[in-house]
Amino acid sequence: YFCHNANSVRNILYLERNGKGYNVSLQVLDAILCHNGEMLSKKYEPDRKKTKEQFLQEYHDCWHKENASLELKPMTLEGCVVRISDVISYIGKDIEDAMSVGILQKKDLPENVVKVLGDNNKSIMNKLIGDLMIHSYQKPYLRFSHEVFEALSTLLSFLGEKVHHHPVLEKENAKLSRMVKELFDVYLEELEN
């Protein structure tokens, strides 16, 4: 299986600097591995007892078990920040991108989401970051208010249905997949000959 987050760890450890990799801490590697924001949680609490061996097993599982990265839990609060930042950074941008290509219009957004989060990237990011800061301040975890979590959850479901699985995008993704496979086959053949 390919997980972009595990591939990022691989790049840092084995590919960067002409194959020498970088010397980074276990906590940094763990935050990178856990940054995948596809699983929304109301509360992000670190697994402070996670060991190097557990990290290595999680890294291995990302390559060998389907959806393994969805179950990852960062070992530090900073890693939790990285994980939720992934969602915060792309949710509003996905809306603006979908609007710019004509898949979505502002009037299509769920009314309860717009009321709580707003209808553009800037307002959504401001609301999510502000709410997270208010409800996480001086706590050993990160969390959203119930209202913001519900709005964000609704928005993610809406985008999944109306944007990420839109027929036009599905068709284009199928084309891209075929093109990448063809390129891979051509380059593999060149390497073998």
Predicted regions and their residues:
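Histidine-centered, transition-metal-coordinating active-site segments
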Residues: 5-6, 11-19, 23-193
